[in-house]
Amino acid sequence: MSLVELIAQADELGLAAGGLACLDRCVPLLGGDDEILRPLWASLAESEEGFRDWGECVEQVRAKLYVVDGPAGTGSAEGEAVVLAHRMLGAAPAERTAANLRKWADVCSVAALQIHGLLDATARAESDGASSVTDRREGRTQDMSPLVAAELRRQISVLELVAAHGPAGLRQARELTTEGRRVLRAVVSRRARGRA
């Protein structure tokens, strides 16, 4: 099943986990520590109380990362990636409804794939643009760069885990996300060393 189909079929929990996982993997671009999104993950694991806490947690994270409208891009791949990451956080819905979460999960999915494409030297050389992101999300994955392929696999796995196991799948989803965040942090660090 393609990523687009998985998002279309996901329930509120799956959509929230999918969007949050994409955002969490991109935390290195936001300047936050690895635990900054923990309260949002915790609110997903709780039932009705979590729904009430979600909006408050979103606002707290935004305040910690100083996001209003997001930073201006610098024209570099890193600058564009930072803008996309801030847009994901800025688009996080304060109200956890299926419609809000579906839109956010979709935005986060596209942005995360674009970020990984921007930061992957192979993908840049291949000019992996918006049409390629759409192709990837719809299941056309030939000639995909390794970094983008890994991000696509993680997005699909998170949605499948939560669909199959409900709240019990959140722990594994978070573990996958932590792995992806480490990979992106290493890529960002390597690119920074290359510029120095």
PLM regions and their residue ranges:
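Alpha-helix N-cap/helix-initiation sites
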Residues: 15-16, 33, 78, 94, ...
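Internal, conserved structured core segments that host functional sites
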Residues: 56-69, 76-89, 105-106, 112
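An internal, amphipathic alpha-helical element
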Residues: 82-196
